Amino acid sequence: MTAANALRSQKARRRIVAYVESYDDVLFWRTVLGQFEDSSRYFEIMLPTKERTGKKVIGRGKRSAIESILSNTGRDMIACVDADYDYLMQGATEASRTLLHTPYVFHTFAYSIENLQCYAAGLHNVCVMVTLNDHRVFDFEMFMRVYSVTVWPLFCWSVALYRADRFDAMTITDMDKVISIAKPSLYNIDNILERVGHKVKNRISLLRKSHPDIAATIPRVESSLVELGVTPETTYLYLHGHHLFEKVVVPVVDCVCSYLVREREEEIHRQAVHRVQMNNELSCYA
C-alpha cells in the first residue's frame, strides 16, 4: 500500500517538459534539472516534435527547441539549449535576443555542453577512469589556462566581428583552424602552445590591417566579455565546443592515457614474481 501511494504521489507531481536540441543533450540536462526536482515537480527531457505532412516528426536544434515553447500554449514547458555565441552577442543578433529575452529558456552560458565536458579540473579524473592509474603526469588545469590565455586575443576579435555582423572576415571555423594544436606528446606541449600563439599573432596582424575600425573596438569588447564572466584564463569554455573537444582536449587526453597505460604495464612487468602472475595481472588490467 505504501509503495502504491508513493507511485500515485509521483504521478500527481507537476510534469515540466524540457525540450533539448539532440539526444546527446538528454543526460546532461537530466543531471542539471534533477537537482531541482522535489515532491511537487519533476522534469521530463525530450526532443521537440513538429507537424510535417500530417504527422509528428522529431525536431532538432536550438531553434526547434525554442520554437516549441513559443508555439505551444500549454504551461510547464522549458527549452534547454547550448548558448553558442548568442550569450556573448548580448542582443546584437536576432538569435541572441531570442535566447536572452524568451522566458523559460535555459542555456549553458558556455558555448556548448562539449565545453563543459572539457572542464579542466575534471580531465585528470577522466584519465583515471580510462587507465586506472592515478599518477598525475600532466597538469590539465595549467594547460587549459595557458591555452586559453594564448587564444584570448583572437577570441575577442571573433566576438567583435560577430557583434558587428562582419564575421565573413573570420568565421568561427576560420578561427578553429588557427587555434588547432599539433599532435601532442608529454614532451612537446610548450612548443605546441608557442606555435598556437604564433598563429594567433599572425592572424591578428592581418585583421588589424584589413579592419582598423574593428581593432578600435577590441578594448571595449574585452571589457564587456569580462563583465559577462569570460576571462582570458577561461576562454576555452566559450570556444567552438566540438572543435575544442575533438581537436584539442581529446588528443591531449589520449596522449596522457597512453602514457599512463604504458606506465602501469611496465610496473606490472617489473613487480611480477613470475610470468604467470604477470600475465594474470596484465589480463586483469586490460
Explain the meaning of each model-derived region:
Residues 1-286:
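Acidic, divalent-metal-binding catalytic cores of TOPRIM
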